[in-house]
Amino acid sequence: MSNSTVRRFCFTWNNYTELNYALCQEFIKKYCKYGIVGKELAPTTNTPHLQGFCNLQKPMRFSTIKKRLDNGIHIEKSMGSDTQNQTYCSKSGEFFEAGDPQCQGKRNDLQSVVDTIQAGNGSLSSIANEHPTAYIRYFRGIQEYIKTVRPIPPRYHKTEVRYYHGPPGSGKSRRALEEATALASDLNDIYYKPRGTWWDGYKQQSCVIIDDFYGWIKYDEMLKICDRYPYKVQIKGGFEEFTSKYIWITSNIDTNLLYKFNDYNDTAFVRRIEIKLLIE
C-alpha cells in the first residue's frame, strides 16, 4: 500500500483486544470530525474484528495512522459517505461513535473554499492549489465571492507611464521588459496587454506593457489608465480594478501619429507620460 495522505478512511482490525477497542475510541475523539468503530464477527470464520470509519480533522498519512493505532490493521480510503459508513459500522449493534456525520458533496466542498478565503488565504492561486476540484467546477463563483468579501481598493496614485518609440529592431521591447522585471515582484507581476478591448488575465499586476502600439486602445481609455483616478478595465464577463503602478508603451511611431480621428491632439496623452524616449 502506498503511503498516501487521506482524510476519510475505513479500517478493519482482526482479533482485537479491549485495549485495541479503547485505543480506537481515543483516536476518534482526538483526531476525527466524525468517527465510528463497531465490534463484529466474520460470518464465515467467526473471526472477531473491529470495523471502523474515520473522517479526520486534518489529512494524515497511512503510516501515521498505523503508528497511532496498529501496524497490523487494514486501511482503505473510504468511497462512501459518512452516513453510509455509519450504517455499515453500526450493524452489529455494539459500537462507539463520536462527532456528527459530515455532509458530502458540493456544499461541503464549497464550505471548505469559503473557510480558506475567510482565513485570509483566499487568492485564486491558493484556492486552485488547495481546492483544485472546487476551483475547476466553481471558478466564476469563487472569483466573484472573493471580489465581494475582499474588494480591491481603487487606484488613487498616479500610474507612471513610459513611452518608447523608434524604428523596428531598436530594442524598445527589450528595454521595457528589462525595466519591468527590475520593478516587478516577479514575472507574474508583469501584464502584457493583448490587442483589443479585453484585459483578460489582468490581476492588478504592478507592471503593464503595451507592446507594438499603434492606436488599438481607445483614446479615452488610454487617458484613463495613464492617470491617477479609479478606473475599471473590461474582461470577458466583468471588470477588474486597474491599480498598476507602471505602464510601458512601445511603438514605431510618435504619439502625435497614434490616432486618426478628426481633431486628434496628443497634448493630454503626453501630459500623462513621465518618460518619453526616441530609441534608434
UniProtKB/Swiss-Prot annotation:
UniProt-listed InterPro entries: CRESS_DNA_REP, Helicase_SF3_ssDNA/RNA_vir, P-loop_NTPase
GO cellular component: host cell nucleus
EC nos: 2.7.7.-, 3.1.21.-, 3.6.1.-
Named cofactor requirement(s): Mg(2+); Mn(2+)
PROSITE patterns hit by this protein: CRESS_DNA_REP (PS52020)
Active site: Y88 (for dna cleavage activity)
Motif extent (RCR-1): 10-13
Motif (RCR-3): 88-91
Textual note on the cofactor: Divalent metal cations, possibly Mg(2+) or Mn(2+).
Ranges of residues in domain CRESS-DNA virus Rep endonuclease: 3-101
Catalytic activity as recorded in UniProt: ATP + H2O = ADP + phosphate + H(+)
Entry keyword Secreted: no
Keyword Metal-binding: yes
Subcellular localization, as worded in the UniProt entry: Host nucleus
Record-level Gene Ontology MF annotations: ATP binding; ATP hydrolysis activity; DNA binding; endonuclease activity; metal ion binding; nucleotidyltransferase activity; RNA binding; RNA helicase activity
Motif (RCR-2): 49-51
Key words of the record: ATP-binding, Covalent protein-DNA linkage, DNA replication, DNA-binding, Endonuclease, Helicase, Host nucleus, Hydrolase, Metal-binding, Multifunctional enzyme, Nuclease, Nucleotide-binding, Nucleotidyltransferase, Transferase
Binding site for a divalent metal cation: E40, H49
Positions bound to ATP: G166, P167, P168, G169, S170, G171, K172, S173
GO biological process: DNA replication
Family: Belongs to the nanoviruses/circoviruses replication-associated protein family.
UniProt function note: Essential for the replication of viral ssDNA. The closed circular ssDNA genome is first converted to a superhelical dsDNA. Rep and/or Rep' binds a specific hairpin at the genome origin of replication. Introduces an endonucleolytic nick within the conserved sequence 5'-AGTATTAC-3' in the intergenic region of the genome, thereby initiating the rolling circle replication (RCR). Following cleavage, binds covalently to the 5'-phosphate of DNA as a tyrosyl ester. The cleavage gives rise to a free 3'-OH that serves as a primer for the cellular DNA polymerase.
Domain topic, free-text comment: There are 3 rolling circle replication (RCR) motifs. RCR-2 is probably involved in metal coordination. RCR-3 is required for phosphodiester bond cleavage for initiation of RCR.
Protein name: Replication-associated protein
Organism name: Human associated cyclovirus 1 (isolate Homo sapiens/Pakistan/PK5510/2007) (HuCyV-1)
